[in-house]
Structures are given as structure tokens and as C-alpha cells.
Swiss-Prot record:
HAMAP family in the cross-refs: MsrA (MF_01401)
Protein's gene: msrA
Catalytic residue list: C13
Membrane-spanning intervals of the chain: none
Keyword line: Oxidoreductase
Annotated function: Has an important function as a repair enzyme for proteins that have been inactivated by oxidation. Catalyzes the reversible oxidation-reduction of methionine sulfoxide in proteins to methionine.
GO molecular function: L-methionine:thioredoxin-disulfide S-oxidoreductase activity; peptide-methionine (S)-S-oxide reductase activity
Catalytic activity: L-methionyl-[protein] + [thioredoxin]-disulfide + H2O = L-methionyl-(S)-S-oxide-[protein] + [thioredoxin]-dithiol; [thioredoxin]-disulfide + L-methionine + H2O = L-methionine (S)-S-oxide + [thioredoxin]-dithiol
Family: Belongs to the MsrA Met sulfoxide reductase family.
The protein's enzyme class: oxidoreductase
Listed name of the protein: Peptide methionine sulfoxide reductase MsrA
Pfam families from the UniProt entry: PMSR
Family annotation (SUPFAM superfamilies): Peptide methionine sulfoxide reductase
EC number annotated for this UniProt entry: 1.8.4.11
Length: 171
């Protein structure tokens, strides 16, 4: 039996999210897809209400959910509603789809730390909602930037971005 855990995050175009998150220590695998919408079996051309998302399988002996969330908040702008870079619409919203109550607690705590830190110019608008069905995207979207390294992305690591705990954050 595997001790691996799952996380489902949305923060703009799934290509850039996957490219950066898959390289993080403790991440075992990733796949991009759609979740949080109205229709079953969504596709790139038909995914009303769904967010472009990434399902992350990680080894909790090497990383934890909090570390994944801190990196997630570093690589996308969680203060813009339904937008990342040039991508606009609910497909590109910032969202955390939690799989259990502990993930929900950690997500809300991390958001409070991000808000208190002043690292972003506004308040976090990231949705925190229970995970529903995750629909894997078409094969051409999987590991897209690994195959097309000069392809489109709006995600960038911010190397000096370090999230302090609330007690250490600016008032």
C-alpha cells in the first residue's frame, strides 16, 4: 500500500503549474486536468465552470502539504480573481481543492499567513473547496512544457519569496 498523498490545485494555465510543481522535492507525479465545474468528462474545448488544475501525488516523508501550498502561492498571483497573466476566466481561477479536513485547515492557515505577510499587493482570493471529481486533460496537455520548453507560461518562481509564519509577519 502506498503512503503517497494527493493535492489538487488550480492557479492559471495548468501547463506552467505542472512544469514547476513536478520539479519540487517529494513530488512523485503530476497530471493536469479539470475540476470544480458542471459537466462530466470535460475537455479543453468544453469545461464550463471547471478550473484548469493539477493533481499532485507526493511523498509525505519528503515534503508536506504546507510546503506545496507555499510554493503554489509563490508561483502564481493569488490576489487576482479569475485571471493569471493574459489568461482570463473562471478556468484560470486560483483554487485549492482539499481532500480532507486537515488539508482544509492547512489551506486556510496558509492563506492567513500569505495575507498577513504583505508579500502580495492585495488579499488572497483563492477558493478553498472540497475536491470533487478530477478529470484528466487530454494527452497533449500532459507535461506540455517538458515537451515544448519554449511554450507559453505565466508562472515564475520568485526566489526571494519566503512566507513567514503569522507571528513573524508584518502587522
Amino acid at each position: 500500500m502506498s503512503d503517497h498523498k494527493k493535492a489538487i490545485l488550480a492557479g492559471g494555465c495548468f501547463w506552467g503549474m505542472q512544469d514547476l510543481i513536478r520539479k519540487q522535492p517529494g513530488v512523485v507525479s503530476t497530471r493536469v486536468g479539470y475540476t470544480g465545474g458542471q459537466n462530466d468528462h470535460p475537455t479543453y474545448r468544453n469545461h464550463p465552470g471547471h478550473a484548469e488544475s493539477i493533481e499532485i501525488t507526493y511523498d509525505p516523508a519528503q515534503t508536506d502539504y504546507r510546503a506545496l501550498l507555499e510554493f503554489f502561492f509563490q508561483i502564481h498571483d493569488p490576489t487576482t480573481k479569475n485571471r493569471q497573466g493574459n489568461d482570463v476566466g473562471t478556468s484560470y481561477r486560483s483554487a485549492i481543492f482539499y481532500v480532507d479536513d486537515e488539508q482544509k485547515r492547512v489551506a486556510l492557515d496558509t492563506i492567513a499567513d500569505v495575507d498577513a505577510s504583505g508579500l502580495w499587493p492585495g488579499k488572497v482570493v483563492t477558493e478553498v473547496t472540497p475536491a470533487g471529481e478530477f478529470w484528466e486533460a487530454e494527452p497533449e496537455h500532459q507535461d506540455y512544457l517538458e515537451r515544448m520548453p519554449w511554450g507559453y507560461t505565466c508562472h515564475f518562481p520568485r526566489p526571494d519569496w519566503k512566507l513567514p509564519k503569522r507571528a513573524d509577519a508584518k502587522a
